[in-house]
């Protein structure tokens, strides 16, 4: 079953609070990939608090070079090295030289057998990447073509594996419908203002993790000039991208708590389902 585990290690932005640290999200998928989305100050300690070794990370995906998103990276790299790991970092091109001086492997994208991660340009005040995750979740079967096959064979074929039944090898494409393969997508924006060009580039997603630095008490023009979004901006993005789930992070320290964001979220008729997590909250998402 395609299942994502998201642990919100830091849900604040720019200035930390005692209960709201700087941006960092741990993502673990059902295939075993472990990805840290941004590395705010203290990210390695927060990983350890939730039982994840920095050395076990598949990747760190950094959205841009502002300090609140990267100050946790040097310590994480050093700790991982001591533990025998090697950190690979996805980052915008403008950050590559600086990151290489840390001794990390720097990548522009990632491609494995069933997961692809690509940079999508967002609308911030500096060079910045949103990170688009696309999972290959297997074949959608044509039930007429698959008639008579045992359940175990159907399970393997759906996952993209060939099977042998009564001496005959059956490949997934032999019993696939015209739609062929199925994909599920998640987009993590990092910092961004409203960004129609990004929506057009991406198309549709299942899950959107979008910043909502401000609720509804700041003029939208001011937020946009700073390269940030309001609650309404994030909701507009989710609807443009046809997201089923919208998760709001990067909440300004001007808010003592997240009650206003949650009041606004409660007024939204799904889709999308809107979540405003606290630090250390865990969200399981079935794709």
From Swiss-Prot:
It catalyses: Endonucleolytic cleavage of RNA, removing extra 3' nucleotides from tRNA precursor, generating 3' termini of tRNAs. A 3'-hydroxy group is left at the tRNA terminus and a 5'-phosphoryl group is left at the trailer molecule. Disulfide bonds: none annotated. Gene3D superfamilies: Ribonuclease Z/Hydroxyacylglutathione hydrolase-like (3.60.15.10). The active site is at residue 68. Signal peptide: none annotated. GO terms for molecular function: 3'-tRNA processing endoribonuclease activity; zinc ion binding. It holds the Pfam family Lactamase_B_2. Its cofactor is Zn(2+). InterPro entries: Metallo-B-lactamas (IPR001279), RibonucZ/Hydroxyglut_hydro (IPR036866), RNase_Z/BN (IPR013471). Zn(2+) 1 binds at residues 64, 66, 124, 191. Binds 2 Zn(2+) ions. Keywords: Endonuclease, Hydrolase, Metal-binding, Nuclease, tRNA processing, Zinc. Zn(2+) 2 binds at residues 68-69, 191, 250. Zinc phosphodiesterase, which displays some tRNA 3'-processing endonuclease activity. Probably involved in tRNA maturation, by removing a 3'-trailer from precursor tRNA. Belongs to the RNase Z family. Homodimer. This is Ribonuclease Z.
């Amino acid at each position: 079953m395609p299942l994502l585990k998201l642990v919100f290690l830091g849900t604040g932005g720019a200035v930390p609070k005692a209960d709201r640290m700087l941006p960092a999200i741990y993502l673990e998928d059902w295939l075993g990939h472990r990805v840290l989305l941004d590395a705010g100050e203290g990210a390695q300690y927060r990983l350890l608090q939730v039982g994840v070794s920095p050395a076990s990370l598949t990747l760190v995906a950094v959205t841009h070079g502002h300090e609140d998103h990267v100050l946790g990276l040097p310590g994480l790299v050093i700790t991982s090295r001591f533990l025998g790991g090697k950190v690979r970092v996805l980052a915008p091109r403008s950050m590559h030289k600086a990151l290489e001086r840390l001794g990390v492997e720097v990548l522009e994208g990632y491609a494995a057998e069933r997961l692809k991660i690509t940079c999508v340009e967002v609308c911030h005040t500096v060079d910045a990447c949103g990170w688009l995750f696309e999972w290959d979740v297997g074949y959608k079967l044509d039930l007429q073509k698959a008639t008579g096959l045992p359940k175990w064979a159907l399970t393997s074929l759906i996952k993209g594996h060939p099977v042998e039944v009564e001496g005959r090898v059956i490949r997934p494409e032999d019993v696939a419908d015209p739609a062929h393969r199925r994909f599920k997508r998640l987009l993590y924006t990092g910092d961004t203002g409203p960004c129609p060009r990004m929506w057009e580039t991406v198309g549709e997603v299942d899950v959107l993790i979008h910043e909502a630095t401000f609720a509804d008490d700041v003029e939208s023009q001011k937020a946009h000039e700073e390269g940030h979004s309001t609650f309404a901006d994030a909701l507009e993005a989710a609807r443009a991208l046809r997201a089923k789930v919208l998760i709001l992070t990067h909440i300004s320290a001007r808010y003592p708590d997240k009650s206003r964001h949650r009041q606004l979220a409660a007024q939204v008729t799904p889709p999308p389902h809107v979540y405003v997590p606290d630090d250390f909250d865990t969200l399981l998402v079935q794709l």
